[in-house]
């Protein structure tokens, strides 16, 4: 029997997820698949997608319901670097440190001649790492702030110019229709169940934008598009279920605030909800248990 209406005291707004339902991947060009495999697969514990992009031109690495896309276009690719930090949830930080130590040793063994920015450090309740091309990663153990996720891309925290956080929050609230707020020089955007985008103001010099991107799925696919199109901000018309834009602007005055390409897809896109393979990265040939090949955590 349903409880009497007067006894129900739920904050329904607190359970809303907003218009951006999923942050699926970030994409950066890499210089060498060997080093990328050692960092993202051996070190961080991701799983190379076994079905798509199995050659040398690109590799997709699965982390729960999310991915990192790592194309290596051309014979001399120009690596791309996020202007910020990618935040992951991993099952166990102690295991992560051991994997990163091994990955670093292997990088020196197989490619000592290549420039390599790889580094990592444990800092309290997180592990901060840098990929061979300079992308910054921060890994966390599962925690209530990340919901029930035990493996996945939890957030991207961008470094943005001073004085832009309030306008960035307005952009996501008013244009993208996602819950966003700004406080103390930082804008935070809610995505889906437990993911976020952060935009943290920094006085440090900004490197030039190099065309890396993030990919999001949105529920209302038309209203943000119409606003962006009317302001001449659509950068690519991909197909019926995808468009892209690069500039975050203040909707009050149109001032350009930060450049990061958003690969924006509808929930009817052919890849939405695609099941991703995730291996049990603790398993080896010496510890193999039949039926334990797949990651059994929650994501």
What are the residue ranges of the model-derived segments?
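Active-site-proximal beta-strand elements of phosphoester/diester hydrolases
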Residues: 70-72, 198-201
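Conserved active-site tyrosine of GNAT-family acetyltransferases
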Residues: 36-43, 100, 134, 168-173, ...
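Vicinal oxygen chelate
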Residues: 1-19, 21-31, 49-50, 59-66, 73-158, ...
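Solenoidal tandem-repeat scaffolds enriched in leucines and small polar residues
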Residues: 162-170, 176-181
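Hydrophobic, helix-prone linear segments
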Residues: 1-65, 75
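Glycine-centered, phosphate/nucleic-acid-interacting loop/turn motifs that mediate DNA/RNA or nucleotide
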Residues: 44, 176, 232
């Amino acid at each position: 029997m349903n409880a009497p209406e007067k006894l129900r005291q739920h904050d329904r707004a607190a359970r809303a997820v907003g218009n951006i339902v999923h942050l699926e991947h970030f994409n950066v060009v890499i210089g060498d698949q060997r080093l990328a495999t050692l960092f993202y697969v051996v070190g961080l514990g991701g799983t190379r997608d076994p079905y798509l992009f199995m050659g040398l031109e690109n590799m997709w690495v699965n982390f729960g319901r999310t991915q990192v896309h790592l194309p290596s276009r051309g014979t001399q690719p120009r690596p791309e670097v996020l202007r910020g930090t990618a935040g992951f949830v991993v099952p166990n930080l102690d295991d992560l440190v051991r994997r990163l130590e091994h990955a670093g040793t292997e990088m020196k063994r197989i490619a000592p001649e290549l420039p390599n920015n790889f580094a990592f450090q444990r800092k309290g309740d997180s592990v901060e790492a840098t990929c061979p091309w300079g992308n910054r990663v921060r890994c966390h153990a599962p925690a209530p702030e990340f919901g029930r996720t035990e493996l996945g891309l939890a957030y991207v925290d961008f470094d943005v110019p001073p004085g832009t956080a309030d306008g960035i929050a307005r952009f996501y609230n008013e244009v993208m229709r996602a819950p966003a707020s700004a406080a103390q020089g930082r804008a935070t955007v809610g995505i889906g169940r437990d993911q976020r985008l952060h935009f943290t103001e920094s006085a440090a010099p900004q490197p030039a934008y190099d065309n890396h991107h993030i990919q999001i799925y949105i529920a209302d696919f038309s209203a943000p598009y119409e606003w962006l199109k009317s302001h001449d901000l659509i950068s690519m018309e991909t197909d019926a279920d995808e468009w892209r834009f690069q500039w975050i602007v203040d909707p009050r005055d149109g001032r350009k605030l930060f450049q990061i390409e958003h690969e924006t897809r509808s929930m009817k896109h052919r890849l939405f909800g695609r099941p991703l393979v995730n291996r049990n990265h603790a398993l080896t040939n010496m510890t193999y248990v039949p039926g334990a090949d797949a990651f059994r955590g929650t994501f």
